[in-house]
């Protein structure tokens, strides 16, 4: 396994293997706990928006770059991270690296795309949580377990908060958290290490890290001295 850090702060972890395929993941240090006040579920909503148009790619281009060549892509949001995953034949690795750098920098979400994807996420909330007794249970547990820490908010959020989100929120969130010094690029598979380094330097190297600090959650959870119950 090899590790290095670019001048802009991007951490790179790679492991060369055999087999003709390669897996690329980009981990961003932002998740549900970082949702803006009154915008629970926003990190997860933003994950969906990252598959939309960029300056040089049309909507859903990641499906074309992965599924059309026999690969796949996916993403997930947790409390502490948002992760984007791509698996493709090795000869398509360079395109995926370019595309991941492209959406890190040049995401362009318009109002129509934003509204469309918000409806998808709200429907996901209704189906997986509100319409499912177990979904409601697991959604309620964090609020019962935590008093102050943002972990108390469910990653999927609430319908009211999702509907309150705006396009300006999207732009601020992208500029604040989707930056090279807040990300880890992981590449595992069949590739030449020297060639991989060259591609990463070419596509991610020019990405500038903003001068301002990355906001971090500093709220401390008080010690629990008794059981938490909800009837």
Name every feature range the model reports, one short phrase each.
Residues 40-54:
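Active-site SXXK
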Residues 118, 167, 171-203:
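Non-catalytic, conformational "gating/processing" segments within enzyme and secreted inhibitor domains
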Residues 1-34, 56-92, 128-182, 206-231:
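Non-catalytic beta-strand/loop surface segments
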Residues 31-36, 106, 193-194:
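Short beta-strands and strand-coil junctions in structured, solvent-facing domains, enriched
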Residues 112-116, 132-140, 187, 191, ...:
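Non-catalytic accessory/assembly modules
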Residues 53-56, 87-118:
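M16/insulysin-pitrilysin zinc metalloprotease superfamily fold
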């Amino acid at each position: 396994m090899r590790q290095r850090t670019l001048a802009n702060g991007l951490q790179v972890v790679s492991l060369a293997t055999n087999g003709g395929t390669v897996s690329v993941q980009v981990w961003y240090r932002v998740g549900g706990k970082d949702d803006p006040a009154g915008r629970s579920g926003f990190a997860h909503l933003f994950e969906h928006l990252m598959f939309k148009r960029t300056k040089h790619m049309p909507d859903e281009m990641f499906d074309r770059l992965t599924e059309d060549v026999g690969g796949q892509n996916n993403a997930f949001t947790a409390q502490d991270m948002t992760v984007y995953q791509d698996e493709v034949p090795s000869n398509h690795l360079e395109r995926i690296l370019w595309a991941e750098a492209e959406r890190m920098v040049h995401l362009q979400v318009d109002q129509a795309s934003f509204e469309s994807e918000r409806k998808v996420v709200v429907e996901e909330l209704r189906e997986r949580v509100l319409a499912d007794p177990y979904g409601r249970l697991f959604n309620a547990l964090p609020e019962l377990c935590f008093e102050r820490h943002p972990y108390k908010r469910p990653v999927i959020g609430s319908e009211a908060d999702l509907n309150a989100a705006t396009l300006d929120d999207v732009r601020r969130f992208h500029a604040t958290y989707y930056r090279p010094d807040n990300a880890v690029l992981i590449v595992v598979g069949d590739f030449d290490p020297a060639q991989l380094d060259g591609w990463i330097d070419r596509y991610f190297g020019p990405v500038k890290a903003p001068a301002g600090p990355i906001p971090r959650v500093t709220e401390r959870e008080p010690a629990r001295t008794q059981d938490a119950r909800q009837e």
